């Protein structure tokens, strides 16, 4: 969990920080069952969302939908990141996006939610196959405005497409 300006870092940073009014909090939860891992990521806003944050949320939402739609059997992993890049770049966020948008999850011990390779990056030729599990994350770090917005979920590739393993809706979590 990162909050305030540290939400821009994308991944957890150690140390304490008091959550303040109008902070942004990036939360990543993971859970393991019989050594299989799943995770979700959300940015939660304490207070009201600014117009910049609402725009970033809309772009991140569009990106995660496009990325999810791009995942399927016999599809190169790179196609998922191409969808990620297309949405962010067309919305003017090329400089605010990360260079990869997810990774595989597997049955590991000690439980870990990052089973690499493979990372999901543009040009990755590895084909998705039924039974493969991936964590997709759409993350923006707008250092100019001081805002972050992240959304991530776990999916499994099926014979006919994909199944998202979280039932949580894609919505902006804020007090507004």
Where are these regions (language model features)?
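Active-site neighborhoods and metal-handling regions in enzymes and metal-associated proteins
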Residues: 1-176
């Amino acid at each position: 969990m990162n909050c305030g300006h540290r939400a821009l870092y994308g991944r957890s940073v150690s140390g304490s920080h008091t959550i303040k009014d109008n902070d942004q909090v990036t939360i990543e939860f993971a859970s393991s069952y019989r050594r299989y891992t799943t995770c979700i990521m959300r940015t939660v806003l304490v207070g009201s969302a600014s117009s910049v944050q609402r725009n970033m949320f809309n772009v991140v939402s569009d990106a995660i939908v496009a990325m999810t739609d791009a995942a399927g059997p016999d599809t190169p992993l790179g196609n998922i990141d191409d969808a990620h890049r297309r949405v962010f770049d067309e919305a003017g966020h090329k400089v605010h996006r990360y260079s990869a948008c997810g990774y595989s999850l597997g049955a590991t011990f000690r439980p870990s939610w990052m089973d690499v390779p493979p990372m999901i990056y543009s040009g990755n030729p590895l084909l998705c196959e039924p039974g493969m599990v991936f964590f997709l994350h759409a993350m923006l770090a707008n250092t100019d405005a001081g805002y972050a917005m992240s959304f991530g979920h776990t999916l499994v590739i099926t014979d006919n497409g994909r199944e998202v393993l979280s039932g949580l809706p894609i919505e902006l979590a804020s007090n507004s």
